[in-house]
Amino acid sequence: MADTPSSPAGDGGESGGSVREQDRYLPIANISRIMKKALPPNGKIGKDAKDTVQECVSEFISFITSEASDKCQKEKRKTVNGDDLLWAMATLGFEDYLEPLKIYLARYRELEGDNKGSGKSGDGSNRDAGGGVSGEEMPSW
């Protein structure tokens, strides 16, 4: 693995322009919130730990997405879907995570199917403004 950070596309930043740091990483507040869930109530997390996890998460996402994208390109498809990501995780040795993610993806698709077309109708569905499903419908991991 290279010593310098690569772009999220996994191409070393050669995808037509440099990626701004704030676009490369998940927000540190989100990272911190997730990390705190694994600690006792009085636990503290150092800035260096948050920064390290932020970097690792970005690298992991790039790693999985790049593998899935390569698969899609070979199959002459332009859109990476959840099944492609699961395939990439299996290919790259993350089999232990597949079953819970398959369950999550199936539930997500089930909820999306139930809510298709209801996002604009004002029917009280739990879609957010961007058309996504709100967190209260999805299982909490």
From Swiss-Prot:
Coiled-coil segments on the chain, per record: none
Region spans: Disordered: 1-23, 114-141
GO BP field: response to heat; response to water deprivation
Induction: Enhanced by dehydration stress but repressed by heat stress.
DNA-binding span(s): 26-32
Domain of life: Eukaryota
GO-annotated molecular function: DNA-binding transcription activator activity, RNA polymerase II-specific; protein heterodimerization activity; sequence-specific DNA binding
Gene Ontology CC annotations of this record: CCAAT-binding factor complex
Tissue specificity statement from the Swiss-Prot or TrEMBL entry: Ubiquitous. Predominantly expressed in leaves, flowers and siliques.
Name this polypeptide is given: Nuclear transcription factor Y subunit B-1
Organism: Arabidopsis thaliana (Mouse-ear cress)
Classification of source organism: Eukaryota, Viridiplantae, Streptophyta, Embryophyta, Tracheophyta
Designated gene of the protein: NFYB1
